[in-house]
Amino acid sequence: MQRTRELESSVAIDQTEVPRSRFFIMVKKLSRVADIVYIVDTFLIPPLHPLKKQHPKVAKFLKVQLVFDLISLFIFATHQLLLLEDGNFGKHYFKRKTKRCSKFSCSRCNANAHHPKWFKFKHSLLCLGTFCFGVYSLVKINKFFKTDQTVDLNRLLELFFWQLNAILNMKLFAFYGDHLESHSAPLDVYEDSFANKSSSGGDEV
């Protein structure tokens, strides 16, 4: 009886959900691409204004860069307006679900259960270190042509090194942050989740 009530409630929730239009889905996908383009253009490409005097052709690239930025901002604004119209703007930004590890047996969860303070300290330190190195790389990229306007193969390889370093450190920051969030839940949370899984499995059998 309880199982049928849960199914009825889930069906009722599904009926209240409004199906997404094709235009909304297309704008959502374009918004993700536009975000990547804007982030790369803003943070990973150094300001090219100091090169205008020595390299006049840079002005054309700056115009193209401005067009891409405007298109990205337009797509981003359109996506936000669609979220407001759909009523999911706050849910999209402020109601993010907490990540939890779904593995029945996990070495990281066991490490957190036995040494919770050390687990949180280690992952917090890794997050802080990767974040600081990533920000330092972004600062070096931002000042790359401001301090020296030389453009040659060695300088471009140096720029590529800082760009790669920034990407890797930010990826590692997100990786360790996800591990810190998903594996640092209290032990009773996992016990409750496993109990719910086993009880639901028993009902199905």
Swiss-Prot record:
Residues 85-124 are extracellular. It is a multi-pass membrane protein. Coiled coil: none annotated. It holds the Pfam family DUF4668. InterPro entries: DUF4668. Residues 1-63, 146-205 are cytoplasmic. The chain crosses the membrane at residues 64-84, 125-145. Keywords: Membrane, Transmembrane, Transmembrane helix. One of its GO terms (cellular component) is membrane. It is found in: Membrane. This is Uncharacterized membrane protein YIL089W. It comes from Saccharomyces cerevisiae (strain ATCC 204508 / S288c) (Baker's yeast). The lineage of its organism: Eukaryota, Fungi, Dikarya, Ascomycota, Saccharomycotina.
